[in-house]
Amino acid sequence: VGDGQPGGLPDILIRGSNSVTQSNAPLYVVDGIPLESPDNSSIPTQNIKSIEILKDASATAIYGARGANGVIVITTDSGSKGAPKINFEYRYSLSKDYNRYEMMSPYEFVRLQNELDAAYGSMYLDGRDPHPDGTPWTLDDYKNVRPIDWQDEISQLGQMHEYSVSASGGTEKTTYMASFNYANQKGIILNTGMKNYVGSMNITQKIGNRMQLVMRANYAEKERTGMQVNYGQGSSAYMYKVWSYRPISTNGVDLTHELEDPERPESGVPMFNPLLQTQNTDQKYITRQLRTSAMFNWNILKCLKFTTSISYTSTESQTDIFNNSKTEAGSTLPGRNDGINGSRRVTRTNNVLNENTLNFNKKFDNIHDLAVTVGCTQQKNVSDIFEAKAT
């Protein structure tokens, strides 16, 4: 499940909603690196070799409490023996919003306002300037008035361009896989978009007949711009403001150019123009992530295997927001805000993980199986946050 905004992450549930206050998202393990809050766009689908879902006791047996919501194990392609192969892909896609809510016509809207509150609803009849011939407005006159469909005003045809190039090959001892991916998306909401860059390199080296070294590196950078539709409150939070804005103007007022509904304050509930809000939103969300890992496998005996790995993950998230005078947050309307303002927030996280396992697996007399696993894990996680605001 996702909110459909450019670069938005899907909400995946494996074992249902086990908690009301905590995250129900599964643990991701990408090439042996546990990631509790991964950006899926940093893992191009073209590079995925296999996906395994752990949803029973095995998830907690291996990953402890982190696997309580299930585990998604992703392994990326490491290349294969053979002559070098170059692959290039280009994809172009279009997106459009469907299943829109059917909005009230001007006639239906005015009739409802009069039924709910005759005093407030009268501004569309007695309170409106008369026709050029001096006759007052009647309810039936609104049957010929063209409505403002704010869903049309704030939307556009979404487009996405995706480019992917990869090189792979290898010998009996060494295999490799290198790739670069770029995506550029224009969202279905005005002034929204996303750019995504991903580069990765995987090398597998056999050492003798019993040992293997696997090295992986991945760098991803994603930039999202424009209105973020969920605000952490659900995908409809932004659209509620669009659906609730009145579809008609009165007395020559062009609602599409007014930041605040000039009639709405009389009812005690301020309403802000969703079109101007969308057009003037200046928000940028940048995520940069570097993942590196090395894994050493040693088949000591036919029934005994030792594996050790070390990984380093560095993640930086940057949020830049500027609210100008044509936005709700930057307006100087009485009782609203302090005017134009801006902010920057940067979060950096560095994670180092070392895992060591010794596996014994042997079958006795073709009847009995004995499997024993001994492991040791060390992990260090350091985070820091910087934030600045100005008005």
Each predicted region: which residue ranges?
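Short, small/polar-rich motifs associated with maturation and membrane association
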Residues: V1-S200, Q205-A220, R291-T292
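Surface-exposed loop/interface segments of Gram-negative outer-membrane beta-barrel transport/assembly proteins
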Residues: S80-R146, G187-T192, V198, N202-R291, ...
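Functionally critical loop-and-helix segments that line ligand-binding/catalytic clefts
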Residues: N299
